Design a protein with these regions (language model features):
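Axial heme c-ligation environment in periplasmic c-type cytochrome domains
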Residues: 45-53, 68-99
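Positively charged n-region of N-terminal signal peptides that target proteins for export
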Residues: 1-4
Length: 99
């Protein structure tokens, strides 16, 4: 069921204008929840967290899984960030990732 929700979210967020709005919302969510460990620009120069700029477009599932369930020292965000917020974060990360 969770995967169905994310698939529906993906199709909803496919329009470019919506993606820009999502990226702006994602920037706010990132600043509030992620920047402490991942840094202001998606990378922590102390190397204590993954460089999010390295995520490729085909790594959406990896990103969602890591956010929901945590990874290494990263805590799980399931129950804290809903599907819409996670998709907004993804839009922000992809808008600022290496091409």
């Amino acid at each position: 069921m969770r995967h169905l929700i994310f698939l529906l979210a993906l199709t909803t967020f496919a329009h470019p204008c919506f993606a820009e709005d999502q990226a702006a919302a994602g920037a706010r969510i990132y600043a509030e929840n992620c920047s402490t460990c991942h840094g202001d620009d998606l990378v922590n120069n102390a190397h204590i967290a993954f460089d999010l700029r390295r995520l490729k477009a085909d790594e959406h599932d990896r990103f969602v899984n890591s956010v929901l369930h945590g990874k290494n020292k990263m805590p799980p965000w399931e129950g804290v960030l809903d599907a819409g917020k996670i998709e907004a974060l993804w839009a922000y990360v992809r808008a600022n990732a290496y091409q």
